[in-house]
Amino acid sequence: VTASPLQGSAESLARPVEVLAGTDLDEHKSGTLGDTVAKLPGVQSTFFGPGVGRPIIRGQEGPRVQVLSNGVGNMDASTVSADHATSIEPFLADQIEVLKGPATLLFGSGAIGGAVNVVDGRIASELPDRPLSGRAELRGNSVNDERSGMFRLDGVNGNWVLHVDGLVRDTD
């Protein structure tokens, strides 16, 4: 038996969260959101062919797992039909949060199995500290002959913020 000298809040105990960001996210990125988070404990990916992978959290999938983009529900056909890919692109993500347990009910009854929130910066939550910033990424995969590229630019002028991103993927 072990004890902690620091008392945790009830919310932190009931809120198991996995966060992929930075180098961890770069190493986990895959062609689908499900494949990107599949290496986390308790998480798997559906498979209905290449390019279609939605998260399965603790055995729950489909409408029981809420997929969010910047905290807003993703209304796409992947929720009700397994042969549709989710419209959220993991290559553009700044961080991906996977929530499991009772705290997911804060996102509504549709999140009874869990929630995956992709934070991609498309909607600015604060003014950037630099007038112009960006990133680009190129990837290749010899197994499925994949070639993909991504770019992102963020700019600020006074109280106006501009965000532009793009992705191209070619695979066999």
Spans of features found by a protein language model:
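Acidic, small-polar-rich N-terminal luminal/periplasmic segments of exported/outer-membrane proteins
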Residues: V1-L127
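Predominantly transmembrane beta-strands of Gram-negative outer membrane beta-barrel pores used
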Residues: Q66, Q95-L99, A115-D172
